Swiss-Prot record:
Gene Ontology annotations for the cellular component aspect, listed alphabetically: cytosol
MF annotations from Gene Ontology: catalase activity; heme binding; metal ion binding
The species this protein was found in: Francisella philomiragia subsp. philomiragia (strain ATCC 25017 / CCUG 19701 / FSC 153 / O#319-036)
Pfam family, one: peroxidase
Function: Bifunctional enzyme with both catalase and broad-spectrum peroxidase activity.
Residues of the active site: H101 (proton acceptor)
Intrachain disulfide bonds: none
Site note Transition state stabilizer, residues: R97
Biological process, per Gene Ontology: cellular response to hydrogen peroxide; hydrogen peroxide catabolic process
Protein name, as recorded: Catalase-peroxidase
Family stated for the protein in its record: Belongs to the peroxidase family. Peroxidase/catalase subfamily.
Gene: katG
Cross-link (Tryptophyl-tyrosyl-methioninium (Trp-Tyr) (with M-247)): W100-Y221
Signal peptide bounds: 1-23
Length: 739
């Protein structure tokens, strides 16, 4: 039915941006490496923000009266508006859907999506078929946002709306954290294999494409009618499991969320199928200007209330759609379900043996009753063996069901916020969860400046090379993802599974470095009697700093990279191996690593994607690549891109030699993806390179930056800029401190 609506309305979908399409090698073809898209490295949201460069949400939040805000939200739930009447006189179910669909776009593969940043306010998400009419939900929240202003973000308010709604309807949440900051424009996430809304599936041969979480462009998870709109219960179960797992949910959490969410509210499909094209207007992004950002104008009947058109499915699941109960599971197991069609022609299921106590109230006409409904996806929770295990368990244990839903809801709405140290507000639960990537709180005294000096000397005397120290620190810190604030150096998870075993980290070499650093750590901690300790996480970063400083010294430059102690060491029990494997990248151009899954001409774009995840801009990415090549820290000791006669010294030789016209570049005849630098006069081979190396002389913007670092007189600038960018990467994920 959703596809029919999209087809009828002529919604052709959105063009996709290139940056995140790197995740699927078969999806994006670049004719040449120089066509690299640098837009992910431009922080346009910050430039476009109307809040000003000095605005600090955390500071502004301090003036928020959270209890007053909550009271206003509770009052709003039952203040039905004539322009969009509340079903059952309560906006609670509507706001739960708003929050869920905002947070539910999160995906583990690259950390994109989720409620943080409030992307649902912008195209394309605001116009997805699955988000039909949520423009009205956000409009209902506007008076509250207007009242509290910049003390509360849109992204926090949207999630809070659903959480307060749950509590008001008898489902007490385990807590809520503020701290989400708003974007000011739609991002360029690649949401599907095809740009056409609901026109093709992200599922091929029964498998969801690894880059995605929703099964089709324009959906949050799956089509409720079944795969591609077909009422196939078994197929629906498979797609549900894959989609929810791609968002980080277990089978138990998936069942709790679906069964709990469908305890509330109703779905809307009042418009007859034959009238949809005539009566339903376009989504917000294509709506007439006089509608002021509201879409899906409905000319059928009153266009609202009982005449509302949403997904096309029509009805409620339970007899008390504005109060938490056990009816969904009771109906699932005690009623016999037959396939029917909604007034809009959508596939749904109604019972053949409904009793008076099973009937559900009409959303707007007192005394009128209807049969309950189920989606094809709802029945999958009963028919699939894996899901059935938990629906039975919850059916027999209502209190467990309530508790598991509360935990799953908190995870759904907070998963993309990163570690708990980013949470603010009075309602943060004390409990820690493994999906928060917890790290221990330091119960010891941090190292002093004198201690740091001693440890640096211990590292210098350890016998570890600069290259070993630099690579280990880089591999530890560069796991960070700005999208969901995961990874980074804090926790020293490079010493734990799965990171210690990743090919890109060269496990055998890594083990040698970690053993030596642990020895230094043990000796230092055992010799301190004043309660001072140093973590392995801090030592890894300090070791990298030492390596860079020593390499600069060998090149004739004196630098001191700032070091901020306070990192702690996570345990294996605090580390979800499956979840952390999503932080493993296919390519890291900073060390010329590739796992072989990407074509050579896609490696420059993969570098940009990596740099974007590290929150770097174009000059920072450029100086880091040039410095890392000079430092000779490539994966597997490769010499590709090491354009220097003094490998291991921190200097600007990479840029000087890259831009030297005495060198002519040709593709290698023997090694695919490799380029040979040949002396124009003698014909002798001078260098070897990858497409990542040569992009800095090929792409006009990157070449402009490279030329700055190759200029006479800018040698010290290069070293200083490298040190600054290096420190930035080492500090990623340090939400426990503010520099």
């Amino acid at each position: 039915m959703l596809k029919k609506i999209v087809t009828a309305l002529g919604m052709s979908g959105m063009l996709l941006a290139a940056n995140s399409a790197i995740a699927d090698d078969k999806n994006t073809e670049m004719a040449t490496p120089q066509s690299v898209d640098l837009s992910p490295l431009r922080n346009l949201n910050k430039l476009d923000s109307p809040m000003g460069k000095n605005y600090d949400y955390h500071q502004s939040f301090k003036k928020l009266n959270t209890e007053e805000l909550k009271k206003d939200m509770q009052d709003l739930l039952t203040q039905s508006q004539d322009w969009w009447p509340a079903d059952f006189g309560n906006y609670g179910p509507f706001f739960i859907r708003l929050s869920w669909h905002d947070a539910g776009t999160y995906r583990l593969a690259d950390g994109r999506g989720g409620a943080n940043r409030g992307q649902q306010r912008f195209s394309p998400l605001n116009s997805w078929p699955d988000n039909v009419n949520l423009d009205k939900a956000r409009q209902l929240l506007w008076p509250i946002k207007q009242k509290y202003g910049d003390a509360v973000s849109w992204s926090d308010l949207i999630v809070l709306a659903g959480t307060v709604s749950l509590e008001s309807m008898g489902m007490k949440p385990i807590g809520f954290a503020f701290g989400r900051e708003d974007d000011w424009q739609g991002d360029d996430t690649n949401w599907g294999i095809s740009p056409e809304q609901l026109m093709s599936s992200n599922v091929k041969d029964g498998k969801l494409a690894p880059a995605y979480a929703a099964t089709q462009m324009g959906l949050i998870y799956v089509n409720p009618e079944g795969p591609d709109g077909k009422p196939d219960i078994k197929g629906a179960a498979s797609e549900i499991r894959q989609a929810f797992r791609a968002m980080g949910m277990t089978d138990k959490e998936t069942v709790a969320l679906i069964a709990g969410g469908h305890t509330f509210g109703k779905t809307h499909g009042a418009v007859p199928e034959k009238d949809i094209k005539k009566d339903i207007g376009p989504a917000p992004d294509k709506a007439p200007i006089e509608q002021q950002g509201l879409g899906w104008h409905n000319s059928y009947g009153t266009g609202m209330g009982d005449d509302t058109m949403g997904s096309g499915l029509e009805g409620s699941w339970t007899s008390t759609p504005t109060f938490w109960n056990h009816d969904f599971l009771h109906n699932l197991y005690n009623l016999n379900w037959e396939k029917t069609l909604s007034p809009s022609g959508a596939h749904q299921w109604t019972p053949t043996n409904a009793k008076p106590e099973n009937m559900v109230p009409d959303a707007h006409k007192p005394g009128v009753k209807h049969k309950p409904i189920m989606f094809t996806t709802d029945l999958a929770l009963k028919e699939d063996d894996g899901f059935n295990k938990y629906t039975q368990e919850f059916y027999n244990n209502p209190q467990e069901f309530k508790e598991e839903f509360a935990k799953a809801w908190f995870k759904l709405t907070h998963r993309d916020m990163g570690p708990k140290s980013r949470y603010i507000g009075p309602w943060i639960p004390e409990q820690n969860f493994i999906w928060q990537d917890p790290v221990p709180v330091a119960d010891y005294k941090q190292v002093s400046a004198q201690d740091i000096a001693q440890l640096k000397q211990d590292i210098i005397n350890s016998g570890l090379t600069n290259q070993q120290l630099i690579r280990t620190a880089w591999d530890s810190a560069s796991t960070y993802r700005k999208t969901d604030y995961r990874g980074g150096s804090n926790g020293a998870r490079i010493a734990l599974a799965p990171e210690k075993d990743w090919q890109m980290n060269e496990p055998a070499k890594l083990e040698v470095v970690l053993a030596k650093l642990k020895e230094i750590q043990t000796n230092f901690n055992n010799n301190k009697t004043d309660g001072t300790k140093v973590s392995l996480a801090d030592l890894i970063v300090l070791g990298g700093n030492v390596g860079v400083e020593q390499a600069a010294k060998e090149a004739g430059y004196t630098i001191e990279i700032p070091f901020v102690p306070g990192r702690t060491d996570a345990t294996q029990a605090q580390t979800d191996i499956e979840s952390f494997n999503y932080l493993k990248t296919k390519a890291d151009g900073f060390v010329n690593y590739s796992d072989g899954s990407l074509a050579s001409n896609k490696l420059p774009q993969a570098l940009v994607e990596k740099a974007s995840m590290l929150n770097l801009n174009i000059p920072e990415m450029t100086v880091l690549v040039g410095g890392m090549r000079a430092l000779n820290v490539n994966y597997d000791d490769s010499q590709e891109g090491v354009f220097t006669k003094t490998p291991g010294q921190l200097n600007n030789n990479f840029f000087v030699n890259l831009l030297d016209m005495s060198t002519k570049w040709e593709k290698s005849d023997t090694n695919s993806g490799e380029y040979i630098g040949i002396d124009r006069k003698t014909g002798a081979q001078k260098w070897t390179a990858t497409s990542v190396d040569l992009i800095f002389g090929s792409n006009s913007e990157l070449k402009a930056v490279a030329q700055v670092y190759a200029e006479n007189g800018n040698e010290q600038k290069f070293v200083n800029d490298f040190a600054k960018a290096w420190h930035k990467v080492m500090m990623l994920g340090r939400f426990d401190v503010q520099e």
